[in-house]
Amino acid sequence: MHPTAARTGVLLINLGTPEAPTPKAVRRYLREFLSDPRVVEIPRVLWWPILNLVVLRTRSRKSAHAYRTIWTERGSPLLAYTQDLRDRLAADGRFAAVEIAMRYGNPSVRLKLEELRNRVETIVVLPLYPQYSAATTGSAFDAVCDTLKTWRHIPSLHFIGDYHRSPKYLEAVAASIRSFWQEHGRPERLVFSFHGLPKCCIDRGDPYASQCQATAQGIARLLELSDDEWLLTYQSRFGRAEWLRPYCIDTLRELPSQGIRHVDVVCPGFAVDCLETLEEIAIANRNEFLGAGGKNYRYIPALNASPAHADILIGLLEPYLALTA
């Protein structure tokens, strides 16, 4: 048993998921997600008609089909893995309460903060985004503040902004890759794929790209990879604006013509597997690579609810125990 900070609670925040793989549920989820000004930095008066008259009409059905390909008996993989990860942290016994919330969809940040409100005196908020971006971590902070500003008594609050260079995080991802290679063999190239971001966000000061680079370099160093054995890419581009390059899908289409026909793809920016990894990376991008002449394409799963992942989060949260002991 570990010493417990009886007054300290933890709120893990993940992005979110529709409640069902149906056009109606996906449309509701996308409306909330894409209405966040942190996510789409376009004036509302211009974005509202585009979102409601074009985007939601065209993407809801297509996205619902993609969700159906990865849906499980427990529902959304993202929610199920996050719940399992929460259970591992709770079982460790160091915190009085551990809850999860989704930035978009359910369970909401407001609901889970209200549940923690009367149970603890200190709340540690940990968004499950290793690399900081205003569109993810910043938005999670907004959601927390939107709730707290309605409370008369606000508990002590600690907010963890990123953990892109956490030694435990880097080593856990590297260890998962080593284990995968021990079982399946090594590829000709390891492709790191992080969620993309409009380049204008970086130009305005978002540290996301530099943190992705630091993470990939740190993992490659632990794996003792030479510069020509790995590369960094970005996925999930949305809209017509320029996003961070190189684009993952374009890279995968080009590699076979360069003589690279065996690749492994890993996505260290995703704490748990979700639509973007299980459908976009593991299925759609695989088809693109094989269609371009590739021979062997493998996706290395996220850390999900593994003991190593729980250990990372405990390491990030543990310093706050001393503050309330």
From Swiss-Prot:
It is found in: Cytoplasm. Fe cation binds at residues 195, 276. It catalyses: heme b + 2 H(+) = protoporphyrin IX + Fe(2+). Keywords: Cytoplasm, Heme biosynthesis, Iron, Lyase, Metal-binding, Porphyrin biosynthesis. CDD domains: Ferrochelatase_C, Ferrochelatase_N. It comes from the Bacteria. GO terms for cellular component: cytoplasm. Pfam families: Ferrochelatase. Its EC number is 4.98.1.1. Pathway: Porphyrin-containing compound metabolism; protoheme biosynthesis; protoheme from protoporphyrin-IX: step 1/1. GO terms for biological process: heme biosynthetic process. Its main location: cytoplasm. One of its GO terms (molecular function) is ferrochelatase activity. PANTHER family: FERROCHELATASE, FERROCHELATASE, MITOCHONDRIAL. Belongs to the ferrochelatase family. Catalyzes the ferrous insertion into protoporphyrin IX. This is Ferrochelatase. It comes from Methylococcus capsulatus (strain ATCC 33009 / NCIMB 11132 / Bath). The gene is hemH.
